Amino acid sequence: MSQLDVLIVDDEESIRNLIAANLKDEGFNPKIAANSTQALKIISEKPVSAVILDIWLQGSEIDGLGVLEIIKKRYPLMPVIIISGHGTIETAVNAIKMGAYDYIEKPFNNDKLIILLKRACEVTKLKRENIDLKSKVIDKTELVGGCPVTLKYKMEIEKAASSSSRIMIHGKVGSGKELAARLIHKQSKRVNNPFIIFSPTCMTTEKINQELFGESEKQENNNKRPTILEFANNGTLYIDEISNIPIPIQVKLLKFLKDQTITKPCGKKTKVDIKIITSTAKNIQDEVNNGKFLEDLYYRLNVFSLKVPSLYERKEDIPLLVKYFVKQLSKFSGLKERHFSDEAIAALQSYEWPGNIRQLRNVVEWTLIMNPLTTGNNEIIKPYMIPSEILANSANLTKLEDSFDMLSMPLREAREVFERQYLSAQMSRFNNNISKTSSFVGMERSALHRKLKLLSLHIPPTNRINEEEYEKANA
C-alpha cells in the first residue's frame, strides 16, 4: 500500500516533530505546518489524506477552527483530527459540528492517535469508494439526450469549458443552468479545484456583501471567516441568478472583476484566480435598459454567452430523460423501477413543459409515488397514471376533440378532422421534425409535406429538414 500523506498543523515545533516521527514509524508520510498560511498552501498544492490540527495555533492568521472550516468547504471528505492542550467540551462539540472527525486532548497517547488516524483514513476510503460506485451508476453531472439541439448544446459546453473567459448562462427556470455550470467546471482544467455555488436570491444587501467581500457592519474585528471569493480561489465560482444582486454590490463586483483582487481585514490585498460563471432567467439587456443592472458589468460577465435549450426544444430527449429519472429515483429514493409505455411517453412529449427539466423530473417522481407496484398492477406506466394536468394540457392523441360530434359528420370530413388532430399532435411530439414524424407515422417525407399543406398545418421554416424537398412537394 502506498504511503498516505498526513499534514500536522501545530504552533509548537516539539509537538509537530514528535507526531511526525511517530507517523513515519507507522508508515505514513508526514508533512508539517506551523500556521494556517503554511497549512492551506500545502493542501492547495496537493490534497493530503488526513490532517492533525491544533485548535488554537497561536500567532496564526486563522485559528484551528477557521482552518477546519476552510478544509471542510474545499475538501468535504478530508478527515481532520483536532488536538488541543486546553480545550473545553463546548470547543470539542463545535469542532465535531463543523466536520472534524474526532477531538483529542494533549497530552495524548500516541497509540490512540495512530488508531484514530488509521480509522479516519479507512472510513474516508470507504466513503470515496461509495461515492465512486454511485457515480458509476448515475452521474449527477450528466447531460442526458442525443437530439440535434442537445448535441449542439454539448459542443457549446465543451467550448465554454476550454475557454478562460467569463461565462453567462441564459435559460428559463428549471432548464438546467446549474448543471451547465457544473459540466463546464468538470470539463475544465480546474476540475480538481473548488466549485462554489453562490445564490443571492432572498439575501439582504448586507448579507451578500458579507458573503462575497467579508464586509459587514455587525462583523466583529476578530471574525476572519473566509469569503466566497477566497473559497473559490483557483476554482470556479457560479453565481446563480446574477440579476438578483443589488446595484451597490454590482459596483463592488465590477471593481473586483477589473483586477480580481480582494482586501483582507488586515488591509492586505490579495490577488485570486477564479473562473466566474453566472446565470439568469431574465433578459439582462432589459434589466440594463431599465437601470436595474450595470451595463459595464453585463459586458464583463457575458463574454461567453451560453443559452440552455428549454425542454420544449428537445422533446426527442424525453424518453431518455424519463429512463434516467426512473433509474435515479430507484437508486436513491427507493422507488420501484418502472417502464413508461409508448403512449405515456407520447403524452409527455405532447406537453409544453413550462417548468422544463425540473418539472419533468417532478412529474416522473409523482407518477412513481402515486402508482406503486402491486400484484394487480404490472410494471408499465400508462397515460392515465400521469398527472391529470399534464394530460389536460397535452395534444390529445387518444380521442377526438369535444368541439365536434364524429357521428354527425360524413366519413371524409371526420377523417380529415382526425388526420389534422393526429398529425398536429405528432408534429408537436417530435418538435416539428419532419424526418422523425414521417418515420413514426409511416409516411414518406414528401407525402407528409403534401398532407400537412392539404390540412393547412404549417411548419416553421427552421424546422424543415430539407428545403429543396419542401419546395418540390409544395410546387
Curated annotation (Swiss-Prot):
Pfam families: HTH_8, Response_reg, Sigma54_activat. CDD domains: AAA, REC_NtrX-like. Gene3D superfamilies: 1.10.8.60, 3.40.50.2300, Homeodomain-like (1.10.10.60), P-loop containing nucleotide triphosphate hydrolases (3.40.50.300). The keyword Ubl conjugation does not apply. One of its GO terms (biological process) is regulation of DNA-templated transcription. InterPro entries: AAA+_ATPase, CheY-like_superfamily, Homeodomain-like_sf, HTH_Fis, P-loop_NTPase, Sig_transdc_resp-reg_receiver, Sigma_54_int, Sigma_54_int_dom_CS. ATP binds at residues 171-178, 232-241. This is Putative response regulator NtrX-like.
